[in-house]
UniProtKB/Swiss-Prot annotation:
Annotated family: Belongs to the universal ribosomal protein uS10 family.
Function: Involved in the binding of tRNA to the ribosomes.
Organism: Latilactobacillus sakei subsp. sakei (strain 23K) (Lactobacillus sakei subsp. sakei)
Segments forming a coiled coil: none
GO cellular component, one term: ribosome
InterPro entries reported in the protein's UniProt record: Ribosomal_uS10, Ribosomal_uS10_CS, Ribosomal_uS10_dom, Ribosomal_uS10_dom_sf
Domain of life: Bacteria
Assembly description: Part of the 30S ribosomal subunit.
Any one Gene Ontology molecular-function term assigned to this protein's record: tRNA binding
Descriptive protein name: Small ribosomal subunit protein uS10
Length: 102
């Protein structure tokens, strides 16, 4: 029988919230008897926006805004039905984007 694997990718702008969510997922998976690898920190995506400070004049005066997207990867190997059920019921903060691949 082939090994099953659940791959969870987490994305958030705040790294503290992201790490707390990853810890909750890891704790839940370990409690239900699944083996786990991660959380693995993935490269932070940095988006830079440059805008003019004044509405129509002074092109040399600009302001830069930065948006950082932090990412983590968690692999759950050989999940039990109890693991999947408890992960579905897990309550995570609204600022965390979750992608799950089976």
């Amino acid at each position: 029988m082939a090994k099953q694997k659940i791959r969870i990718r987490l994305k958030a702008f705040e790294h503290r919230i992201l790490d707390q969510s990853a810890d909750k997922i890891v704790e839940t998976a370990k409690r239900t008897g699944a083996s786990i690898s991660g959380p693995i920190p993935l490269p932070t995506e940095r988006t830079l926006y440059t805008v003019l400070r004044s509405p129509h004049k002074h092109k040399d005066s600009r302001e830069q805004f930065e948006m950082r997207t932090h990412k983590r990867l968690i692999d759950i190997v050989n999940p039990t039905p109890k693991t999947v059920d408890s992960l579905m019921k897990l309550d995570l903060p609204s600022g965390v984007d979750i992608e799950i691949k089976l």
